[in-house]
Amino acid sequence: MRVMIVDDSAVVRGMVTRWLEEAGFIIAAIAVDGGQALRKLADTSVDVCLLDIEMPVMSGLEALPKLLAAKPDLRVIMASTLTERGAEVTLRALDLGAADYIAKPSANKLGGADLYRKDLIEKVRHLGARAARPAPPQAAPRPTLAPPSSDPAGPIEAVVVASSTGGPPALRRFIAGLGADWTSPILIAQHMPPGFTRTLAQMLDPISHLTAREAQNGEPIVPGVIYVAPGDYHMTVRAAGGGGPSIHLDQGPEVNYCRPSADPLFESAARFWKGRVLGVVLTGMGRDGRDGAAVLAKVGGTIIAQDEATSVVWGMPGAVANAGLAEAVLPLDQIGPYIASRARSVA
């Protein structure tokens, strides 16, 4: 697997080169800015590019669309800072076609560099493996449908969503596909650090008539709202004093190496709404959401998984599909309309 490193810091270039070479990757090219990266890409075979956002001459955000125009199948990982501006620029980059991002460790965070190294190696390995596969056929993939595990338990009172790598752009398209009549609350566990999730909610807010916001502990869950789990917090559903659903946030142990994790969200939603909740598992690495989907399916809830062809990484949805938990395995743009149609049929 061939990697290009683009960063204006000699220290970062040297450190990342050493890490990736020790992990068995080939460093095909190294560049100090976006312009140099474009010139090197013209005569170098590259599978994955680690692209810094803030650089002189040509920034990562400026270079990204040019790199993808030159090599459409290039998998780009944006290297971002854990700041509000870093979050905004990163989400813009994901919309422009970046496959993923990695948050640079803060200097005062104990063990930050080691976690960064492990995260980087995992992302490069998964994205590089995807880039090495043959391109999917141009024809639209056919959806895989399975019979429902049980009869619909009544109207869909809520939707819970799991997403990770490639999730922000996928969430935009999924929400847009629900249509103007959708009112049931949507609860999202997207793997992102603190600060990024607030920016994600702001990005999702204008997509539809629904109000999107970062969830707050104890607030009631009401129709017409999209709740995004804050970074570094698990989000679950609990009964409020009057018996209605409310948001509970906690910093319990990571689940599937994640916080927020989809499994606690799905499991708590299954306990509260039983079969009247629908789970959606979108693109992402790992298997987060699989165990929660199993709990949800056991009480009669419905699970929809994104298909492999439209996923950046078919880890999470693949785990659900391969476990036989999904009623439907669909291309991304079919998920929203499918759910909206299903909701109308049981209303």
Swiss-Prot record:
GO cellular component: cytoplasm
The CheB-type methylesterase domain, residue ranges: 152-346
Enzyme class: hydrolase
A GO biological process held by the record: chemotaxis
Record Gene3D superfamilies: 3.40.50.2300, Methylesterase CheB, C-terminal domain
EC numbers, comma separated: 3.1.1.61, 3.5.1.44
Reaction(s) catalysed (UniProt annotation): [protein]-L-glutamate 5-O-methyl ester + H2O = L-glutamyl-[protein] + methanol + H(+); L-glutaminyl-[protein] + H2O = L-glutamyl-[protein] + NH4(+)
Keywords, alphabetical: Chemotaxis, Cytoplasm, Hydrolase, Phosphoprotein
Record's comment describing the protein's domains: Contains a C-terminal catalytic domain, and an N-terminal region which modulates catalytic activity.
Protein name as annotated: Protein-glutamate methylesterase/protein-glutamine glutaminase 2
